[in-house]
Amino acid sequence: MPPSAVTLSRAGALFVLCVALGARAEGVGTRLHFALQGNFDSNGAYLPGKVGFNLADVSSVEQLDSLPAGVKGLVWVGQCAGVDAAFLATVRPYVGNPNLLGFYLMDTPDPTGRYFPRCAADNLKAESDWIHAYAPGAKTFIVLMNMGLSKTPSFAGSYNPANSHVDLFGFCSYPCRTELNSCDFDMINRFVAAAESSGVPRSRMVPVYQAFGGGDWVDDGGGRYVLPTVGQEREILARWGALVPTAEFDYAYSWGSQRGDVALDSSFDLQTVFSRHNSAN
C-alpha cells in the first residue's frame, strides 16, 4: 500500500496504492489495532496478536472463526462494482459472525478512472448500505487515494461519508523517506487537513502508521521509503495521537513484507514500540 502507480495482487484481490502520481503519550486512544498482510502462519495461527494487534486482516470465514478471544476481523472485499453477485458471494458468509468488525471495501479506489479502473461513489454507497442493512453494526472502511502530492495532498472529488456512506477512512501519509534524510512529520498534519477539507471528519479517520521501509517501493519525490527508527515511530504515533485522539481502530502498514520491504514481522525494535502503544490504548 505505499504510494506509487503500482498494483499488487493479494489473495486474489487487486491492491492499488496510495498516490495517483507516481515520556509523552504515544498514539491514539483506541481499543482496536490492525496490521495488514501476513497475519497467519502456515498452521493458521494469528501472529500480530503477540504484540497487541487485536484486529486481524482476514480473507476467509475459517480465519475469522479461528481468531483468539478478544480479536476481531476486518474482511477484505476489493470490488467496487456495487451489490452484484460477486459482492454478495463475498460478504454474505460473514454476516452474523461474532468475530466480525467490518469490511475493508477498497484500498485507494480511483474516483476518476485516470490511474486505475474508476470506482464510483454510488457503488461504494450501495455496498455500504447493504452491509448496514444486513450486517447491523458492521463497519465499512476504505483507504483514500491521494489525488495530489505528499507536499500538497488532496482528496477533492474523492469519497467522504456523504457521497459513499462509508463509515471509516484511512490515507497513506508515510513521512520517512530517503530524499528527506529523515521524516517529514508535518506530512501527517497536511493529510489530515486535506481529508477534513474534503468532507471526512476526524471522527471518521483511521490513523495509518508507516511501519515498513526499503524494497521496490518508490515515493512521489523520487526516493524510497525508510523503516522508521524507534524514535521516529514514536513521533509518528504521537503526531497522530494529537490529531485524532480517538478512533474506531488504528492501522500499521504493515505486519508482513511486500515487494521485498522490511516490515513489522522482522523488526523487533518496532514490535516493542507497537506492543507498548497497543497495550496502553
Locations of regions flagged by a protein language model:
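Extracellular cell-wall/glycan-interacting regions and their flexible linkers
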Residues: 1, 14, 23-27
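Glycan-processing catalytic domains of CAZymes
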Residues: 25-281
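Bacterial N-terminal signal peptides
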Residues: 10-20
